[in-house]
Structure formats: structure tokens, C-alpha cells
Amino acid sequence: MKPSILEKLQQLGDRLEEVTHLLGQPEATSDMDNYRKLTREHAELTPVVEVFQNYRLAQSDLADAEEMLSDPEMKDFAAEEIEAAKAKIDELDTELQKLLLPKDADDDKNIFIEIRAGTGGDEAALFAGDLLRMYSRYAERNRWQVEIVSANESELGGYKEVIARIVGLGAYSRLKFESGGHRVQRVPATESQGRIHTSACTVAVMPEADELEDIELNPADLRTDTFRASGAGGQHINKTDSAVRITHLPTGMVVECQDGRSQHANKAQAMKVLAARLNDAQKREVQAKEAAERKSLIGSGDRSERIRTYNYPQGRVTDHRINLTLHKLDFVMDGDLAEITDALIAEHQAELLAAMGD
């Protein structure tokens, strides 16, 4: 293990002792905000320090075993102990490096997921609907809630564009690598000749800002328009100008919300989406620089990148970033995404570990 990492681990051990002492003081709960902060820090530090203690114990076992090598009667036993200790050290070394990987502060947040139909017209819109169902079913498997924030439906079904909010612990950590181009190859329902068509959708996954204060929104930078909602909403919603369109003038970003029951509700939701988009734009700029340094294809934030192909005739799903192909398309489209998301997270961790070793 690198000396710099050992030094960092020693510092974390010292800090855990300090935090434990502070939490044990009689006045610790007088400032509840600080108390919660210390409790959270204690919970984060404890597993790292415990593994480091086991690492040092394994090193001590190795040293003891090496001393026994000089005793002819203990030589065979010592060799076995050395082999076991070295294997344990390697295992704990890898575990420690993973624990030291920089945490994404957004991982536990709720998300907004935007799905836009691209090339392929009506077929792309139908596929956008299929993707929404896929993510909704995945959310159900994780006991997350799904809310439709805004939807622009196409004439034959599906969506030209749809924004959903997914509420649940870890939603961003599991779905953040879904951003990018999704391509589908299949025979459309409207195709009489049985020819396979290729269509595409773009998916954007954005963490929900904790509060609007997370990002400064100058009222002078915003233009708010109201208009009559259309689509599913009933007679009530069509009689009033309840739909809201907010334009962020410096960037040209436009957010529309019309699925709420009032103008106030739609404006509040639109502001949340806008804050998430602006935060996301800043985050992607940083990610792009970091990914370029790592020569990474995962987590680059590049929305134009084609990340996955869904081939219906072959029942195949291929994620191009990690060359993963699964022949279980029906299961994936029904929300069985765990194998894909786990593989993407593992590859991302491997890239970060490699960067730490440079």
C-alpha cells in the first residue's frame, strides 16, 4: 500500500477517536445540527477504521510467520501462515481502497429522469414509453416511488418527451449511468413489410437538488409563462391557465409542467426540474474533465454518446461502454436492470481505483 494512503488511514483513525470523544461529552446534544453531523461522520469513519485495524493485524500475523521460518520444525507451518496472511492483506488492501474512493454526494438523492424521442418518429416515441415503463418497473423492484412531472404524448402512444421523478434512497447511485443514447432495433407495429427499423431515445438522469438554495436562481434570469394544459388532466385542468413554462434566459433552458392540479404546483415542480438541470449541467462539465483524464467511457456525462442497444429480433441488450451483452431483453424491459447497473458501478469503481494507483 502506498505511504500516502497509509498516512490518510492513520489520520482517519485519529479523527474517529476525536469524534467519539466529542460525542461522549455531556453538552454534545446541545447543538443538534452539529450532533447529527458528528454522528454521520462517526458512521462513515467506523467501517474504514475497522478494516484498517484488520489490515494491520494481518501485517502483524505476516511478520510473526516470517520469524518462524528460521525454525526448521515450524517451516512448513510458517509457509502456510505466510501465504494466508498475504492473501488476507491483499483482500483488505482492495477493500480499503474501495472505502477510500471519493463519495458522490448525490448518490442518495432522488432523481429526475428525462426521456426524449430522437430519430425514428412515432417508433422512437413508443420506445420512449417502453423505457419509462422499464425504469418504473425497476423503481418498483427497489420500492421507490415514480411521479410523472411532465409528458408530451405522441399520437400513436408513447412520448415525444417525458420527465419523471423517482423518489427513493440510492436512486441516483443506481441509475446515474443511464444517461446517454439508447437505440432500439425492432419491427414497428406500423411496418407491413416486416422490416427492422432503428430508432433512438436520449435519457438524462439528474439528481434532485435538496433545496432551491443549492443553486442560485436570480428572478431576473427567469421568464414565466402560463398556458392551458392539454392531455390527461380532465375538464378542470383545461379551463384554467394552470400549465407553467419557465425559461432560464442565460442558458435558454425551458421547463414545462402541466400535470399538477394548480398553477402553483406546476410552478414549484418546474423550478425543481430547472434547478436539477442547472446543477446537472455543472456536474457534467466536471465529470467530462475527470473522465477525459481517466480515458473513461462511464460517467462522462456525454448525452450524445450511444450507450446501449436493445435488439428485439435477437432478444439482446448490449451496453457498449463495458461490452456487456445479455440475452434476456424481455426481463430487462420489465425492469430487471440489476445485472447491468451492478456491472456499470463495478467498472466505474475499477476506473477510480486505477486512477488512485497512478
UniProtKB/Swiss-Prot annotation:
GO terms for molecular function: translation release factor activity, codon specific. The gene is prfA. GO terms for cellular component: cytoplasm. The modification N5-methylglutamine is found at Q235. This is Peptide chain release factor 1. InterPro entries: PCRF, Pep_chain_release_fac_I, Pep_chain_release_fac_I_sf, Prokaryotic/Mito_RF, RF-1. The keyword Cytoplasm applies. NCBIfam families: prfA, PRK00591.1. Methylated by PrmC. Methylation increases the termination efficiency of RF1.
